[in-house]
Amino acid sequence: MRKTFQTIAILSLGIVAVIAGGQRGLEETASAQAGAAVTQIPRFRAEGSWPKLPSKWVMAIVSSTGIDEQDHLWVLQRPNTLSPEEKPKAAPPVLEFDAEGNFIQAWGGPGAGYDWPETEHGIYIDPKGFVWIGGNGNDDQILKFTKAGKFVMQIGKGGQKKTNADTKNLWEPADVFVYAKTNELFVADVYGNKRIIVFDADTGAF
């Protein structure tokens, strides 16, 4: 019986030691992970003077940004979201800045031959340097422009949303991407429809 008690006591002490060691190991691991996480998280500071917008203009809600092959920043913003007092100073919807934040050019808005989005949503600069614009208001189209703002092509028609089977119109397209090797335009047509639809980036053919 005495040996039994001794055995139980030894086993109990061993178990306590294992638990204590395991707990200490977990605490050390958690502490190390916490320390690593703190050192790995970068700290950012907002640069209030970047980008440098002409003083005559006011920027509204920014819906999308893109970077071209020159590392220029392209901004798509929504002038209609400004207050009535600020709207006269609204900057154009499309703004281009260089890598240092210097203003390059601006353009966009309603024009002849295309349906400008009711609500500006997405901007993308493809490998050939064309600028694609999409909307998510009553917008069932995407627009293609040169970097200088010259209209090139429209796929779809505003207010003509139908179903996933429609290959001519979109339904508030969320985003686009051009695969350079095949020159195919991939459209994430997912707000209204639930699909990825592909067009020829030059002709707009399905």
Task: Give each language-model segment a name.
Residues 7-13:
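Sec-dependent N-terminal signal peptides
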Residues 4-7, 18-206:
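Eukaryotic scaffold repeat domains enriched in small/polar residues
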